[in-house]
UniProtKB/Swiss-Prot annotation:
Pfam families: LSM. It comes from the Eukaryota. This is N-alpha-acetyltransferase 38, NatC auxiliary subunit. Gene3D superfamilies: 2.30.30.100. GO terms for molecular function: RNA binding. Residues 3-72 form the Sm domain. It is found in: Endoplasmic reticulum. SUPFAM superfamilies: Sm-like ribonucleoproteins. Component of the N-terminal acetyltransferase C (NatC) complex, composed of the catalytic subunit Naa30, a large auxiliary subunit Naa35 and a small auxiliary subunit Naa38.
Length: 72
């Protein structure tokens, strides 16, 4: 297994924070990525301009991801 795969595997089922280029933020459990680099999250909450909403399962295309961090 290569270093990138090891790192990605260590993030599975962890809580992550993703910000996309339109300034929305998503916090959810990281499930996987697809071949195009999209992040798939479950139990996700979206935060936008002071409001939040529960979304559940979401797919965030990699080309829209501004930042990705694993929460402690």
């Amino acid at each position: 297994m290569e270093n990138g795969e090891i790192l990605l595997t260590s993030w599975l089922n962890r809580s992550v924070h993703i910000e996309i280029f339109d300034e929305r933020k998503f916090i959810g459990k990281f499930l996987c990525t697809d071949r195009e680099g999209a992040a798939i999250l479950s139990n996700t909450t979206e935060y936008n301009k002071g409001f939040s909403r529960a979304l559940g399962l979401v797919v965030i295309p990699g080309k829209h991801i501004k930042s990705f961090s694993v929460r402690a």
